[in-house]
Amino acid sequence: MVAFNGHSTAGHVSAERYLNHPTFGMLYRVAPVAEGRDLYATLYAQRIFFLVTLQSRGASFEVIPLMDARHHAEQNLARARRSGPEEHGRWRQLFDQTFI
């Protein structure tokens, strides 16, 4: 894992969140994974996926394969489906933009 002091910015839609990685640049949040852990992907470069754990001293990044990232995003879609059509629609759009 690589650790650094990251910065996150929440957008007007709950799905829009970004981090700045010191090597790979801007990352965007693809899906929440667990409490304090989210799935992020590179915004500009070749598609690289990270499990990011936010901590008081910064963030730690774990690179994961595409299929693992897709699995986490699909689990998030299933959770969002139970929360209602509006939330599911937002996450579905982000899923489609990322994986399809």
Model-derived regions: residue spans:
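Short, compact, well-ordered microdomains
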Residues: 62-100
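Long, non-catalytic architectural segments outside compact domain cores
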Residues: 1-65
